[in-house]
């Protein structure tokens, strides 16, 4: 399995670590720490040196209760950072955005993946993504970032997320985005309580029936904090456990804050999976 963008390819026969680069003042874990262009590029460099093969640049906090950001502000935050990384490093760049303007401009300056928590549901986003020809990550979220954690409710979380993916894949294909350009993210922590999150993690491998890359993001999230009763800065061990559980089930991309530790954990996973006669990766 491979992804293609900007004249390059990403081989998904082994798990990739995606380093989180939030250029926001209010992200739940690292808001305000990489706001200047120099700081953002420095942090990207550190993550790449630690083994990240994808950098995920986000200019709008999507934590529960987060305020919305204007198009102009998000463009000012994101585009210079994407351009600077693209010019300096041989790394894939993902842009965490829902806005069509940011999708288009990111593609022009070198982004490889559109990572949209709203699955191209904003007006014009679907058309913008189709125009760029870039791979798109579709994520499941119940509600919206402001309200999603108020009282999430499912009869069957896996079945509902699975049905959502079926609908969104069809919607993308109708808009001219080929299925092989899509990635899937169950959306851990987005409109889900503790039970929903762990039931999805336990059944993650079942999403392979789509034959699409799976991206997961559980790093430092409340599904770990609530379980262990610790704050965001003390969630490394829980984050690594989630990353390993996902990768052992064949997750292709693990989105994290702590790159070095996750890369080391993935080496252990790869050694274990390659020792099996029947590998889970193709």
Residue ranges and their predicted role:
Residues 1-2:
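Extended, charged alpha/beta regions that create polyanion-binding interfaces
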Residues 91, 178-181:
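Short acidic capping loops at alpha-helix termini that bridge into adjacent secondary structure
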Residues 42-58:
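Catalytic domains of carbohydrate-active enzymes, especially glycoside hydrolases
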Residues 5-6, 12, 29-38, 42-43, ...:
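Active-site-adjacent loop and "lid" segments of alpha/beta metabolic enzymes
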